Amino acid sequence: MSNSLLILGSTGLVGGQVVKFAQTSKDFSKIFTVTRRKPEFANTASTTESPRIDTIVETDSSKWPQAISNLEPAPLAYISAFGTTRANAGSAEKFKEIDYGINYESAKAAKEAGAKVCVLVSSYGANAKSPFLYMKTKGELENAIIDLKFPYTIILQPGVLLGERNESKGFGNDWAVKFGKLCKGTWFAPLLQPIEASDLGRIAVEFAERGLKGEFRENVLKVSGSELTELVDDFKIV
């Protein structure tokens, strides 16, 4: 296949896994990543970057939309696993600027460039009416992405993400991850809906592939919590 894929957030826990599984896909001949720093792709077979991957390093994220507009061939599928936390951003305003602003403008640029499928990694409990900043921002972003009207928009709403991170996401998130590991597979799992980042990355790539093949009846799909964990055994991209 001659389809190209754009991945945002490739230096993160989930994004690195998206890159890993995209490399095994037969549906993408070209994989673009746009990032502030050159990523160390997670668990790749070798330390050499795949020739199918083109990494655009741009330290000024406000220039990412223009960089996306200039991609050749234009990506037909777009996956965003990009995001941060208030603790890492430093303030509520900066958090929204990163988590909502960069995500929205990049998705808009991908849509205008011709992308047919958008897969957004959001969060379990995302709700634009939530009193909590994180959930509210995620919900607002979901609504804004849906309003862009990609032919297919798939929103993944995972619970606690399990896996080895390169940096802390703040005390609250670190605590949730530790508890999520303990409760995975137990009766307490529905509280946090834990999922391995590798499984979520695999699922994101699978949805992008299926979207390009027109396998969905609905234009907008939301897959949340336990629905994602149920897909782990169904989606096999290995």
From Swiss-Prot:
It comes from the Eukaryota. Keywords: Membrane, Mitochondrion, Mitochondrion outer membrane, Transit peptide. The gene is FMP52. This is Protein FMP52, mitochondrial. It is a peripheral membrane protein. The keyword Mitochondrion applies. Its main location: mitochondrion. Belongs to the FMP52 family. SUPFAM superfamilies: NAD(P)-binding Rossmann-fold domains (SSF51735). InterPro entries: NAD(P)-bd_dom (IPR016040), NAD(P)-bd_dom_sf (IPR036291). It is found in: Mitochondrion outer membrane.
